[in-house]
Amino acid sequence: MVVRKRRNAVRTVAFLSPWLIGFTVFFAYPLLSTLYFSFMRYDGFTAPSFTGLKNWDYVLDKYPFFWQGLRNTLWLVLVMVSLRVVFGLGIGMLVTKIKSGLGFFRTVFYLPYLAPPVAATMAFAFLLNPGTGPVNHVLGEIGLPQPGWFNDPAWSKPALTMLALWGVGDLMVIFMAALLDVPREQYEAARLDGAGAPQRFRYITLPNIMPIVLFAVVTGVIQTMQYYTQAIVAGKVASGKIANAGEQFEPGYPHGSTWTLPQLIYNLGFQRFDTGSACVVAVILFALSMAATALLLRRGSGFLRED
């Protein structure tokens, strides 16, 4: 009996070993190493030395860009994720109503999502150029204000949000699948009871697709917490520094309005060679992502139980 239990235990560990190895190498070890180096003075070249909480004090109190980067990241999480979910659901509902040409419209709305982030951001920056871009030209022709977009601190984050909405095809596809899976009988019964479109959406559509909405929000929050490529490329294109990598570039252009936490990690770790402080920001970013995910799953599961 003991031998059989031991064999079963060995067999279980053997089957789990690929996952355990992957989890240890790609998650547990990097996480613990990041936490370890957040308490060390380390530039990537010399031996690390223990500094206690000095790195944390520097990032939270003396590093001039941390709080601005945190505010920008939270702004993007709240605004960008919310609008992407709303637009993705709205477009999904519109496309599912189309009687003919469904495949064509689905492809048209999904294709922008497949565009490489760097190329898409560069194209958007040129389109929204306040001096030569066609968008401001059209706005001027019809008598509307012409924003500075990526050159204006007040408009840079809304411009990044517009870029994210342009590539909302991924959410459209998953919402379409969820909407098409809602039982038609429920809609027919609601119509017979005299329920209008708003009532059908609130009491039939939304409860049925709530798991997909929760999935879209959670994954959107995690992805936006790691927002890096579009913000830095947009800043470089708008500042005119994209063509020459040797030119001095103002991080977070314009005036720090596009700083995000991942950019701070890059700035500290690879431009200032302050690996310890970069690890502090990485630990904070991980903690925020975990806290936001746990909160959303807890609140979301409450909505699911209620439905």
Please tell me what each predicted stretch does.
Residues 1-2:
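Juxtamembrane low-complexity tails/linkers enriched in Ser/Thr-Pro and polybasic
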Residues 5-307:
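A structural signal for multi-pass alpha-helical bundles of membrane permease subunits
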